[in-house]
C-alpha cells in the first residue's frame, strides 16, 4: 500500500500533516518487517516524492551556503576532489551555492568536470526546515524502539565520486543508519559481513582503498532518488556512484557501556569544571597530608552537591542528557542559537514548532527552574507558574504575551517575565514568533526610517 499523499492535497509537499500521513505507524511497522527489526540491510522503495526530494536538495544547498559563509571548517566539513582530500578550503567556500542554483548548476560552477565528494557531520544543527521534516518522519520509529543512547545524528553526503573517499570501512560501533537518498543520481552500497570480508596479509582492513578484489563477496544495494536505505550497525561498507547525488544519513547512535561511561565523565567535567591555568607548586607536605589539592578541588562548581557520590552525580548528568534529547526530538546536537535580539510585541503570536517539546522541572535549589529547549538547558529563578506556561506552549496553540501572563499570579511583573522567557526560548529556537499587523507596521516604519537616514547621511 502506498503512503504517498494525494496530489490534490499536496500544495506544500513538506507540510507536516502530509509527512505524518505519509510516514505513519503503518509505514514504520512495514519498515521494521523489511529490516528484520533493524537487523538486516534493506532498500525501502516507498519513500519521498520527487517534489519532496527537490525541496530537501534545496535545504542541503542552503546548509552548504551557510557553512561556506559563516561556519566554514568549524563543524567538520570535509572535501575530496579527484580522490584527494582538500586541506585549504577557503577557495571552495567562496564558491558556495547561490539561492537561484540547483545542485547541478552549482556543482558545474564549483567543480566543473572533476570528481568530488563532500561530507558534513552534525547536519541536524543547521536547516530548521530540513531538521523539522526529518524529525516528524522519524517520530514514530523513536516511539517504537526508544531513544538511542546518544540520540540521532545526521551526516550530509554530496558528490559524484566513484567511491566513498573513506574506502571500505565501518562506522563507530553502535551506529545504525537510515539514508534518505535525495538524488538526482542513484547510489550503490556494497556491504560485507565480517566473515565474508577477507583481506590479504599486509592489506588494510579499515579504510581499505583496494576495493576491486572484494566487490564479489559483498551484498549490493542500489537506491534511487526518494528511496531510503537502511544499514544495521557494525557493517563493513562502501558507497559507489557514477552520477551526482545528495544523501542524508540519519544515525541511530548507541554506545558500548564503557564508552558511554567515559562520555558521562566528559560531560561532568564540561559542566562542572571551568577552565583555569593556575600553576601548582611542589608539595612539601607529609605523605598523608592532602591539603595541597584543595585549590584543585575548589575548581569544581558543585554548590550544594558536594556530598553526593560519583554515581548520583553521573546519574544526574545522564538525566540532563535525556531531557536534552527529548526536548530536541532525539537530535544529538542542538541547533545554532539565533543571534538577533527579537522584540516581541504584546499581540504577536508565539508557538512551539512541531514535533519539538520543551521540558520544565523544578531545580533542587529553592525557587530555581530548569527548562530544556531544543537540547539547551536554561536555568531560571523566581518564576512560579513556569510549568503551566511551558505546558501551554507545548500544546501547539499560538499564544500572546498577555494570554501567557494571565496564567501567572504575579500581576505586576507577569508580562515582563513572560516577555523575557519568550526571548530566551526564541534565542534557542524553542518558539517561533508571528508578528501582529501592528508589529509588522512598526517594523516597516523602522525600515523606511533607516533607509531615509542612510540616504541623508
Predicted regions and their residues:
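Acidic/polar N-terminal loop/beta-strand segments that form early-domain functional surfaces
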Residues: 45-49, 123, 374, 436
Amino acid at each position: 500500500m502506498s503512503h504517498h499523499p494525494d496530489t490534490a492535497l499536496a500544495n506544500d509537499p513538506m507540510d507536516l500533516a502530509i509527512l505524518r500521513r505519509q510516514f505513519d505507524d503503518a509505514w514504520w511497522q512495514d519498515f521494521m518487517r523489511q529490516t528484520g527489526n533493524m537487523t538486516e540491510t534493506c532498500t525501502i522503495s516507498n519513500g519521498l516524492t520527487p517534489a519532496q526530494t527537490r525541496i530537501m536538495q534545496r535545504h542541503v544547498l542552503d546548509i552548504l551556503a551557510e557553512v561556506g559563509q559563516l561556519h566554514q571548517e568549524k563543524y567538520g566539513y570535509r572535501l575530496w576532489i579527484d580522490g584527494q582530500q582538500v586541506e585549504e578550503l577557503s577557495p571552495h567556500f567562496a564558491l558556495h551555492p547561490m539561492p537561484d542554483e540547483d545542485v547541478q548548476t552549482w556543482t558545474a560552477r564549483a567543480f566543473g568536470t572533476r570528481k568530488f565528494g563532500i561530507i558534513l557531520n552534525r547536519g541536524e544543527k543547521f536547516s530548521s526546515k530540513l531538521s523539522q521534516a526529518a524529525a516528524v518522519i522519524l517520530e514514530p520509529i523513536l516511539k517504537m524502539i526508544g531513544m538511542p543512547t546518544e540520540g540521532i545524528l545526521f551526516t550530509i553526503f554530496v558528490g559524484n565520486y566513484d567511491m566513498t573517499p573513506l574506502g571500505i570501512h565501518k562506522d563507530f560501533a553502535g551506529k545504525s543508519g537510515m539514508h534518505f537518498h535525495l538524488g538526482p543520481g542513484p547510489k550503490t552500497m556494497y556491504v560485507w559481513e565480517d566473515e565474508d570480508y577477507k583481506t590479504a596479509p599486509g592489506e588494510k582492513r579499515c579504510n581499505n582503498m583496494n576495493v576491486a578484489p572484494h566487490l564479489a563477496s559483498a551484498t549490493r544495494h542500489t537506491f534511487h532518488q526518494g528511496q531510503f536505505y537502511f544499514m544495521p550497525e557494525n557493517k563493513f561498507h562502501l558507497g559507489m556512484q557514477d552520477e551526482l547525488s545528495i544523501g542524508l544519513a540519519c544515525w541511530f547512535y548507541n554506545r558500548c557501556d564503557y564508552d558511554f561511561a567515559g562520555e558521562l565523565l566528559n560531560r561532568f567535567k564540561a559542566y562542572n569544571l571551568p577552565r583555569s591555568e593556575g600553576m601548582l607548586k611542589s608539595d612539601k607536605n607529609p605523605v598523608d597530608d592532602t591539603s595541597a589539592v584543595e585549590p584543585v578541588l575548589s575548581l569544581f562548581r558543585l554548590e550544594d552537591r558536594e556530598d553526593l557520590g560519583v554515581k548520583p552525580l553521573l546519574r544526574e548528568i545522564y538525566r540532563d542528557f535525556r531531557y536534552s534529547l527529548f526536548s530536541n526530538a532525539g537530535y544529538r546536537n542542538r541547533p545554532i542559537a539565533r543571534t538577533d535580539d527579537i522584540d516581541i510585541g504584546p499581540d504577536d503570536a508565539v508557538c512551539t514548532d512541531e514535533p519539538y517539546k520543551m521540558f520544565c522541572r523544578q531545580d533542587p535549589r529553592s525557587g530555581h527552574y530548569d527548562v530544556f529547549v531544543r537540547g539547551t538547558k536554561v536555568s531560571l529563578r523566581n518564576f512560579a507558574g513556569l510549568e503551566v506556561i511551558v505546558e501551554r506552549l507545548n500544546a501547539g496553540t499560538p499564544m500572546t504575551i498577555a494570554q501567557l501572563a494571565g496564567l501567572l499570579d504575579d500581576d505586576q511583573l507577569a508580562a515582563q517575565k513572560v516577555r523575557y522567557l519568550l526571548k530566551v526560548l526564541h534565542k534557542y529556537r524553542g518558539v517561533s514568533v508571528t508578528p501582529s499587523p501592528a508589529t509588522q507596521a512598526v517594523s516597516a516604519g523602522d525600515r523606511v526610517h533607516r533607509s531615509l537616514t542612510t540616504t541623508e547621511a
